[in-house]
């Protein structure tokens, strides 16, 4: 699938239905909350250094759930605190908020929440010193230019950059067949060529991402990137890649039951890559526009991940993966297998967790644009 197809067909499940991202993104929120102190400290330091009259903030890969506007609220409050401490006699800066995701994202779900967002903002400020906040959507891939030069002070990308711009071209042979048969991503059955293809695509994409943001950001601007990663050089571990291995096994289980065809499993390839810390740091150094201020590895405490009653970790993961992958799975396999697929997946995650822990790793990366 090329970049244009990916931009058109990949999106989180919209609305607020049972399988929507809005109702099934609490695992992502927990990771973002774990990193929140780093994010807000970075924004506070940026404001202290630059003190702009108008502050441009971009949320890249914003999706459409409640996490989006709650994150923006945190940003505004953080700047207000820094402002009143540093320059209390000056008026508050204006906030230009740029929400970005692929065109299929349910931006309307966010827009419908904006009236309540502004009401709460006024209430939190006692209808007094309330900042001017301008929010706009910018659909498109962040693996390309999105904004005019020198307009963005702070970039936030949470759970976005482990999604590649496309499935690596090197994953296919001369006949256009996947060389990663039986796996939807890197797994224990994958060859070295598969790992190299994904790694190469990540490096190419991440370099383009950095180059584009360097054009759009002001000098000394900051980026906070929250990325699913892996702990060491091995591409296969019981971390983030293992969740996709279990999805492969779940689909294979349906193949064995005659629910879908083996060819469909063999031809379903995801555009996901969990980088190592060395790979992230290496591309930052190589591209050269940013200084790496901070790179921390977080292991987010496992959580039931839902407020709808007691559910297992496997169920929480299954709900999250479905909300993230449903658009692509429906395109490839059809809708009728999804309930059975994720029932199987839920069971497999819980069974594996009972045998041995699964340790998904999250990186928090803070970058400062060089002067």
From Swiss-Prot:
Q: Which GO terms describe its molecular function?
A: metal ion binding; S-adenosylmethionine-dependent methyltransferase activity
Query: Which Enzyme Commission numbers does its entry carry?
Result: 2.1.1.-
Annotated binding of S-adenosyl-L-homocysteine, by residue: 21, 62, 67, 101-102, 141-142
Q: Which Pfam families match?
A: Methyltransf_7
Q: Which residues does (11R)-carlactonoate bind?
A: 28, 162-163
Keyword Acetylation attributed:
no
The superkingdom of the source organism is Eukaryota
| SUPFAM superfamilies assigned to the protein according to its UniProt record, in alphabetical order | S-adenosyl-L-methionine-dependent methyltransferases
Catalysed reaction(s) here are: (11R)-carlactonoate + S-adenosyl-L-methionine = (11R)-methyl carlactonoate + S-adenosyl-L-homocysteine
- Record keywords: Magnesium, Metal-binding, Methyltransferase, S-adenosyl-L-methionine, Transferase
Which Gene Ontology BP annotations are present? methylation; regulation of secondary shoot formation; strigolactone biosynthetic process
**What cofactor does its activity depend on?**
Mg(2+)
The main enzyme category here is transferase
Question: Which of this chain's residues are annotated to bind Mg(2+)?
Answer: 180, 266, 268-269
Q: What's known about how pH impacts activity here?
A: Optimum pH is 7.
Influence of temperature on activity = Optimum temperature is 20 degrees Celsius.
Cofactor: binding comment: Binds 1 Mg(2+) ion per subunit.
Q: Name the family the entry cites.
A: Belongs to the methyltransferase superfamily. Type-7 methyltransferase family. SABATH subfamily.
Q: How does it assemble?
A: Homodimer.
- Record's function text: Methyltransferase involved in the biosynthesis of strigolactone natural products, bioactive compounds promoting plant fitness and soil microbe interactions, but preventing shoot branching. Catalyzes the biosynthesis of (11R)-methyl carlactonoate (MeCLA) from (11R)-carlactonoate (CLA), downstream of MAX1; MeCLA is probably biologically active as a hormone regulating shoot branching and serves as a precursor of non-canonical strigolactones (SLs).
Q: This protein is called what?
A: Carlactonoate CLA methyltransferase
Q: Which organism is it from?
A: Arabidopsis thaliana (Mouse-ear cress)
